[in-house]
Amino acid sequence: MRRIILISYLICLILLVSSKAYCQIHIKFQIGGQEKEVIPRVESVVMQNDSVISFSTFNTSNTELTIPAKGAYKISLSAHNYQPWESNLNLRNDTVINVIMQKSPIALQEVVVKGTKTPTVTATGETFYLSSKARKEKDPFKALSEIPVLKVNPISQSITTRDGSSPLILIDGRLVNSGINPILPADIESVTVEDVVSARYLDQDINKIINIHLRKERPLYVYFEERTRHDIPLRKGFVGSNFEIGRSHFAVYGSVFYNYLTKDRIDYETLEKRNDQQKQLIGSNISRKNDFDLKLLFKYEPNARNYFAWNISNRISNMHKSATYNGEYLNNNISNKMIANDHTKDKSNGWLGSFFYEHTFKDKSSLDVYSYFNHAKANRRQQYAEHIISDLIPTFLSLDNIRNQVGLDVDYNGVRHKYGQIEAGNHFLYTHDNLWDNVFSPSVLTHVSQSSNYSYISYSKVWKKIMLMTSVGLQGLFVKVDSRSDSYWRPKMSVAIGFRVSKSQTARLSYTLNNILPSPQQLVPVSSSVNPWQKVEGNMNLRPIQTHDLALTYDIKILDWLRLQTFAKHKITTNMIESFLRKENNYVIQSYRNNGCYNRWNTGFGLSINSNSVQAYLSPALSWEHYEGGNRLSSWGLNGNLTWWALDQMAIQVEAEWKNKSYSAISITKYSNPMSANISMAWYPTDNIQISAGITYLGGIREQITTIDTPNYYQRQKMSFHSESFRPWILFAYTIRKHNKLRIENKMPYFDMDR
């Protein structure tokens, strides 16, 4: 009896397995290129009802795929340098599918590039293509470090251009706020570095752009990153996480970070003179600060033509400063001992909510709509007291600020035609600040409202070796401070002409016209200083400034690994807003005024070295400045960096920057040693782990001296940054990127909550 039961059980089990195997569908792919070339690596994704059933990789010896059961499926194939292949199939039986994959053309500035790694020169910049070695990297910053016109720090995850500017990062031409961290280098088609921006970005005070073009496949993906960095001993650090998870049509991105600063010491030596009085103080300022940043982004792409995104961000910041100074007070040559104490508390809390929609038309042109609302609160409490003999001279500062800001941007992006490319749009921004001065009773309330409405149109075209981009706009500026109202209409313009002298030489001439409103702090007639001798006040009569930037650059590719760029720039600022001093009763008032023209000339060169394991950059520059009614002021600067990759798993990076002087309309600052001198090392034991260590500032104790010298007032202040000088630190990061090629692109525009 037992034998019969056992045999019956085995027969049922065999039948069950057989039926299961019988229900499976086997698909054999015969994959090749248009020229019958063999494609060595093809990735496949099988989806059913928006769920991923299978994700696998084919090679020349394995092109078979197994489907669990009969039904309707969506099958996608992708390969490097080939256009993706997709098909919706209703599978009932085993089948053989022949697939011919077409190579991907990349159209940029009317230049179509197929299968080439040679950089493409445009009217506004240059487009680069990552090497096969860079595409195999897991860290996008490590991959981007091979671009010769960028200075990339994979340890701090930062990117700057050759002149030290922090560029705006775009993904496929769209502003983003989640950065490039989730990107897998294999998904990067090209990287465009734009030195001249169109009128669309002028109202955002953007002058450099990095545009990263991605492949179009969008599989199921998961991205998670944990990062923590700390000085030794503890002074400055952070801990936080980034994550992104989603399917082919919906995704959620989040970021949570805590930043801190503690026991940060800065030493001061201050000398002040006024009439027959003199103060000389020496002491230290100890700071501590805590920041909390939260970001959530929801992305929804119902189809290839429509994209939606919702974002919410919160930033909370608290800072405390405490200082004690000792010295002497001199009045009519009579000296007395003096002690001063300073205590400051700053708090801020800002929220940002935004919505973004993009619609793509049949001809691949697109319409973008971006709306946002920002609400922020900030307050400062400061108490300063001077003790001279038995006298106590206290000064208080108590300011509260509430800001509400709303914006709406509408942009049309045309496609490239034989006659060129056209873009147009309108940007509206309204900002309202309520500022309370609580020192008085009752509190004094000041209202500041600023509006900007900006319309523009851009045109670009390429004629063989000549490339043109021209962009013009009209901006309406409206300012109201309490009962005073002003309105202005100003033009905006951006023009760039590029000329390809030869395959290795390019010249570019550019001109930019822009307008900048005064900040609310420059407009409010409320003192923001606790110095008993000096007040700092705004001026509600300020007008917008206008800037004219003219630049000429000449790029030479000397060798495959060696590039030289020479540049000459001239900036003219009319209605220049500058600081000035005036005497009023027993006070020296520092305020702001529109004072004619400001001119700045800048010239220099940059030398880039980019070999297999070494990236280096060195750039000296000379500058001349001229304020209205003043003398011509000169300065020089030098910045450089060196990155050496050892065995592809370890990087050593050195960064340094020198500058001898900087100027304002009333002061001069001298730097006695380098402004920065850092060394760091990163080790990647696995694709998921990064361990880094370094030393901040190797140039001794960083110091600077600022001097104000006028007939009515003299001040000399020396600052020594003890805590940040020669400070070791350590960083640990753990990153997971799974099936990143199916990620939804993040097109939500970036919003700076500090602007």
Could you describe each region identified by the protein language model?
Residues 515-565, 572, 590-602, 719, ...:
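Outer-membrane beta-barrel signature, preferentially recognizing the C-terminal barrel domain
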Residues 34, 42-47, 78-80, 96-133, ...:
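Short, acidic, small-residue-rich periplasmic hinge/interaction motif at the N-terminus
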Residues 227-232, 247, 258-262, 314-320, ...:
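Transmembrane beta-strands of outer-membrane beta-barrel pores
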Residues 684-755:
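C-terminal beta-signal and adjacent terminal beta-strands/loops
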Residues 96-100, 110, 140-143, 158-159, ...:
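N-terminal periplasmic accessory domains that precede
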Residues 153-197:
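Periplasmic plug
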